[in-house]
Each structure stands twice: as structure tokens, then as C-alpha cells.
Amino acid sequence: MKGYLDMNRLMLIMYISIIIIVSYMLIPVAYAAPDDEGAMPDDDLIQQQLDNLDISEIAKFYENFASEDYPDIGTLLKDMLRGRIPFDVWQIIKNLVSGLFKEVWQNIGLISNVLIIAIAAGILNQLQSSFDSKSAGEMAFYACYILIIMVVIQSFRQMMNYGQEALSNMVLFMQAFAPTMYTLLVASGAVSSSVMFQPLMALLVGVVGTFVKDVVLPLLFLSAILTLVNHISDKAPLGKLADLLKNICSWALKLTFIIFSAIVIIQGITAGSFDSVSFRTAKFAVDNFVPVVGRALSDSMATVVSYSALVKSAIGVIGLIILASICLFPAIKIAAVALVYKFAAALIEPIAQPRICQCLNSIGDILIMLFTLVFSVAVMFFIAIAMLIGINSPQAIL
């Protein structure tokens, strides 16, 4: 238990540290924003950068997953390049909260079905003495429990599909989004970062996506099945095995998160520092060793690189928005159903048999684990995009 608590404490520290690092990586976007109209970016140069950039794949994901209230991707990109964020943060928070309660309300039917069956099982249990034998009461309980299992498996399988779909879409998005960022890294002078990140990111995203979908999710589903079977009878003790599988999923996720975050952050800091030094050296050489036009040439190079870095930051923030949109809606659905099971377990505890309450509560815990899994993968990819944004930011290269 102590080791488990220490691991949770370590994960909490990791989350806080990553939030600080990601916040720092997003500072370039804020610093790049103009303070007044006189500091507005060169529209022609920005348009030239955008014309040479293929964001059609990113636009498809944006159109599929972004809210209807959001502006189109072209307008959003230009607004961000001018330092304007066309979003109402409080409205987004309200939409998320209302979406959670809406999902809970839509699953009231699930609570009703479980409550009716659980109450029937409780009544039959109280009337057990009127049966000719104890086995008849057990048979009545088994009948009710099988009905509950059918309801639980149907909803749990649907939540698993939401989780698998979210993970697949996040991996596909990262595979479509990364080439654009690599192109902008090269344009902004981060050649080393692009060369180092491209194979590494492709490998990490593919490995994490495959591992979570093909290993962790099936183990989690098997844990849920064993949990349901375990509570059918006291003579089928499978609770420890179900807990073991759930703990394996938890530890595998935590280990994957730590390894992924450490590799991406260390790689980003190392490559970014090297590119910054390389660019400053090249700028100094052109400025001092090219006769007559050296100064003008180095200033022009710095301007082009700065605008490329600015476009990269804006594209990166749009990527974060799309990634959040892909993750949040399935995560909200999963969290809502988890709350429904937890609420149902608490509600029927006074009248239903303990085995039914424990079953529903355990399924709620597994759904919370599924929510954590989807959210953690999104955070990993979020870190990767934030590191790409932070490499060769305008204030770092000038």
C-alpha cells in the first residue's frame, strides 16, 4: 500500500511539473503577440508562409472534431498570428460542465434499469425464507444478477469503444499533424530538432498507441469481466486476479507516461539548445563575414525564421485545440457513466445485496481507470506538441 501511495505521489509531482513545463513552452505564443497595431506582423510574409504550407490533413481533423461555435481554421490561424484568441474560456468550461451533466442525465435510463433489477433482487432476498429451500433464493438472485450483467456489459462495451476510438483518433491526428510541424521546424532553423524528432516521435506515438489499445485496454476489459464473475458467488474467488489485472494496467500506464514524457522533454531541450546555438552562430557568420550585404542578409534571414517560428507556434496551438477536442468528448462520456455506476451503487446499498453494490462500485472504478487512460495518452501527446511549439521560439533564436 505504501509503495502504491508513493507511486501516486510521484505521478502527482510529474503532472504538476509537466504543467509548468508546458506552460513555459506556450509562452512564445503570448510573447509573439503584438502589443499594438504598429507591431502587427507582416501580412504578406505570413500569407506567403501559409501558402507554402499544406494543412489540409489538420483542417480535416479540425472540421470533424472542433465545435460548431469555433471559427474556421484559416480564420483561427490568422487571429492567433495576430495575438488574438477567439475563444471564451469561461464558456468552454461551462460547455464541458454542462456536457458532463447532460451525459449523466442521458444515462438515467441505465440507473433506472439497474435500480429496478437491484430492488427486485433485494425483495427476493428478503422473501427467501418463504421459499422451500435456500437454493431457490439463490437462483432468483442469479437471475437478477445476470440481468444486471447484461446491462453492465452493454454499457461498458460502449465505453470501451469510445476509449478505443479516442485513442485511434489521437494517434491518427498525431501522425497527420507531425509532418507539418517538422516542415515548420526546418523553416524556423531547427534542422537538428526536426531530424531527431521525426523518427523518435513516429516511434513513440506508434508504440504508445499500439501498446495502450492492444495490451492495456484488453487487460482492463478482462479485469471487468472477472469482476462481474467474482460477485456472482462467494465460491468463485476471482477478486484478487481482477485487482491484479487492474493494477497491471495502472502501473503500465504510469510507466509509459514517465518514459514518454522523459524522452520527449529531454530530447526537446537538448535539440532546441543545439539549434539555438547553431542559428546564432550562422547569423553571426553571415553578419560579419559577408561583405556589404551581410548585415541586411542576416536580418532578412532572422525575419523569415522568426515568422516561420510564429506560424509554427500558431499551428501548434491549433493542434492542441484539436487534440483536446478529440479527447474531451469521449472522456466526458466515460466519466459520466462512471459517476452513474458509483451513484447507483450508493443508492441501492440499503436495499440490495452487497454483491450487487460491490459489483457496480468496482465497474465504476474500472471506468474511472479507462477515463484516466484516455486522458493520460492525451496528456502525453499534448506534451509532445508543446515541446515542438517551444523549440526555436522567436525569443529563443533572436
Protein language model annotation of sequence segments:
Residues 142-155, 174-191, 211-223, 228:
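Mid-bilayer segments of alpha-helical transmembrane spans in multi-pass integral membrane proteins
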Residues 132-141, 163-174, 200-211, 238-252, ...:
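Membrane-interface segments at loop-to-transmembrane junctions
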Residues 120-124, 128, 225-229, 262-265, ...:
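Alpha-helical membrane-inserting segments
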Residues 294-303, 340-398:
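Transmembrane alpha-helical segments and their short flanking loops
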Residues 197-322:
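Generic multipass alpha-helical transmembrane bundles of integral membrane proteins
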Residues 313-354, 362:
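Helical hairpin unit composed of two closely spaced alpha helices linked by a short loop
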Residues 2-118, 122-141, 155-165, 169-170, ...:
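Gly/Ser-rich, low-complexity
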